[in-house]
A protein has these predicted regions:
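Acidic/His-rich, divalent-metal-binding segments that scaffold phosphate/diphosphate chemistry
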Residues: 2-120, 139
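Structural motif
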Residues: 75, 135-136, 166
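A short structural micro-motif
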Residues: 89, 151-152
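Cytosolic nucleotide-binding catalytic cores of signal-transduction proteins
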Residues: 142, 146, 150, 157
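Single conserved hydrophobic/aromatic residue that forms the stacking wall/gate
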Residues: 155-166
Length: 166
């Protein structure tokens, strides 16, 4: 009886090692890893909360809404929640250029042309991918970062520019 208990304990430890090896070898991502990544005390999310508190709150709200939507349509809610938490980490490179992080009525976009301003805003996606690489985030999470504004060209038309860039 105790022998089975011991064997099962050893097999359980090997299962965790096997999960890790499968993830690294074949690019799988387990719910165990997703739960670890979605811990708001993880290094990247803690840094996001300190550098971009508005973006962090936005990401938390998006994660909650997206996870609920995923549950209702039968998608992988833990993956969606984790991806949503990380989708805007690129904003840490230029936090003051995003309205959710601005305070004191200072808007750095006022000193830039529309094109320069748009480039700063759009670059948060590539900046996010660089941070994701630096922190070894899984490809599934990187996919949320790279596609959260869609796959088409972002265009702000002349008449609506004042609405987006004040």
């Amino acid at each position: 009886m105790f022998l089975y208990f011991g064997i099962n304990g050893v097999l359980l430890l090997f299962a965790y090692l096997l999960i890790y090896l499968l993830e690294k070898t074949f690019g799988f991502i387990s719910n165990v890893t997703l739960v670890e990544l979605s811990d708001i005390n993880s290094p990247v999310l803690r840094q996001l909360s300190e550098i971009c508190p508005g973006t962090f709150q936005h990401s938390m709200q998006v994660a909650n809404l997206a996870a609920e939507a995923a549950i209702r349509v039968g998608a992988k809610s833990q993956l969606v929640r984790t991806g949503a938490l990380y989708h805007d980490i690129g904003k840490m490179e230029n936090p003051a250029f995003f309205t959710e992080n601005q305070s004191g009525g200072v808007n750095p976009h006022k000193n830039l042309s529309y094109e320069q301003s748009a480039q700063v805003v759009i670059s948060h996606v590539t900046d996010g991918l660089k941070l994701a690489d630096k922190h070894n985030l899984p490809k599934a999470v990187k996919d949320f970062i790279s596609t959260h504004h869609g796959l088409s060209l972002i265009h702000i038309s002349e008449p609506t520019r004042p609405l987006y860039i004040s």
